[in-house]
């Protein structure tokens, strides 16, 4: 199994997007939405070769006639049949490889149910006959990608956000905090506040339009109250967006009200602390001697940290919470959307990592439970 010729596959299955490619590459080859779509209507044209389900970009392009489902919610796989379709699509259509010939590195959110990880292992070995596999924690991979061994990672994707403090390469499990507030909640919130403007978005396909509006136009205000005042006083913050049917809509304070919920979850009716408090609480759960190093290495990763202005706002909020003498540094690399995948690519190509793989033999001997012993 240790032949260097065989490239390992790295698959970062996010709640919103699936990133896949080969270990040693500097970017994923395939990035597509983690969606499975099924037709809402009866097929009437014979010979069209209609399928009973579509995955990823194809589902996205035919979304007008499909019901779209995300098999991963809050980082946890809730629909295994659909998940299998996504993996099948990843290996055979996107990467065009035979999964039985390559070891696979999968990723997972911290504090996920153990059964989730066992089932992933089982499917890889029994359905796809992988020769070897490994499950890595997403935030740890982001730190690898930033070239550090110490820091606290705030990883916020589509389904889940979490803060993971890591010191000299060791994750500190007692201080890991998880926040089930991420991109999908922001998309839903934007759908809601756009309704107040008189634009109605309800179907699963329309949610994808709103997600696009969010990604293109939203930003984080440095001072929310002041920004609200500016928006009320003038139209300088308004932007327009053209819908697929040609209708043009205008959005103003929604642009920063939407991502503000990351800092004020009460906007979503959630009784939890914002991402800045979560980072601070996570640091405070660590030993007093290592806090200084964590404050100086706050690494952001994941698509929901891509909003313009988020790093400056984070700096401001953490500075207000932390002791006044302490140095605070927010690291927000431009490729942070893919830093989990990039970290996986680095990890899977390290020579020292090659003995960490769970092989098919080990799996056949011990069953799915082996994943807890061999993967952090």
UniProtKB/Swiss-Prot annotation:
It catalyses: ATP + H2O = ADP + phosphate + H(+). InterPro entries: Actin (IPR004000), Actin/actin-like_CS (IPR020902), Actin_CS (IPR004001), ATPase_NBD (IPR043129). CDD domains: ASKHA_NBD_actin. One of its GO terms (cellular component) is cytoplasm. Oxidation of Met-45 to form methionine sulfoxide promotes actin filament depolymerization. Methionine sulfoxide is produced stereospecifically, but it is not known whether the (S)-S-oxide or the (R)-S-oxide is produced. Its main location: cytoplasm. Muscle. The modification N-acetylaspartate is found at residue 3. Keywords: Acetylation, ATP-binding, Cytoplasm, Cytoskeleton, Hydrolase, Muscle protein, Nucleotide-binding, Oxidation. One of its GO terms (molecular function) is ATP binding. The modification Methionine sulfoxide is found at residues 45, 48. Residues 1-2 form a propeptide. It is found in: Cytoplasm, Cytoskeleton. Its EC number is 3.6.4.-. Actins are highly conserved proteins that are involved in various types of cell motility and are ubiquitously expressed in all eukaryotic cells. Belongs to the actin family. This is Actin-2, muscle-specific. It comes from Bactrocera dorsalis.
């Amino acid at each position: 199994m240790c032949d260097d010729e065989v490239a390992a596959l790295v698959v970062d299955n996010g709640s919103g997007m699936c990133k896949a490619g080969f270990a040693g590459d500097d970017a994923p080859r395939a990035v597509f939405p983690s969606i499975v779509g099924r037709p809402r209507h009866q097929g009437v044209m014979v010979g069209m070769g209609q399928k009973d389900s579509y995955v990823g970009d194809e589902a996205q392009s035919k979304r007008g006639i499909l019901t779209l489902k995300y098999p991963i919610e809050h980082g946890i796989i809730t629909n295994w049949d659909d998940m299998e379709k996504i993996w099948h699509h990843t290996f055979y259509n996107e990467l065009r490889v035979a999964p039985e010939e390559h070891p696979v590195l999968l990723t997972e959110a911290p504090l996920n149910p153990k059964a989730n990880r066992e089932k992933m292992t089982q499917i890889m070995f029994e359905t796809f006959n992988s020769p070897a596999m490994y499950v890595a924690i997403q935030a740890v991979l982001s730190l690898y990608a930033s070239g550090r061994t110490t820091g606290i990672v705030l990883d916020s994707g589509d389904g889940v956000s979490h803060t993971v403090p890591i010191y000299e390469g060791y994750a500190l499990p007692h201080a890991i905090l998880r926040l089930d507030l991420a991109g999908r909640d922001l998309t839903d919130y934007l759908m809601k506040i756009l309704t107040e403007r008189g634009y109605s978005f309800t179907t699963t396909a329309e949610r994808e339009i709103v997600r696009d509006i969010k990604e293109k136009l939203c930003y984080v205000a440095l001072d929310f109250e002041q920004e609200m005042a500016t928006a009320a006083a003038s139209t300088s913050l308004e932007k327009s967006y053209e819908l697929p049917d040609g209708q043009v809509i205008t959005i103003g304070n929604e642009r920063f009200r939407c991502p503000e919920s990351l800092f004020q979850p009460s906007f979503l009716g959630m009784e939890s602390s914002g991402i800045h408090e979560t980072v601070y609480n996570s640091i405070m759960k660590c030993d007093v001697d290592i806090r200084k190093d964590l404050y100086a290495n706050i690494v952001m990763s994941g698509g929901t940290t891509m909003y313009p202005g988020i790093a400056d706002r984070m700096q401001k909020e953490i500075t207000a919470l932390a002791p006044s003498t302490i140095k605070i540094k927010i690291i927000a690399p431009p490729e942070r959307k893919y830093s989990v995948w990039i970290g996986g690519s680095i990890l899977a190509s390290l020579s020292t990592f090659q003995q960490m793989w769970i092989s098919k033999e080990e799996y056949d001997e011990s069953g799915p439970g082996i994943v807890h012993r061999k993967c952090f």
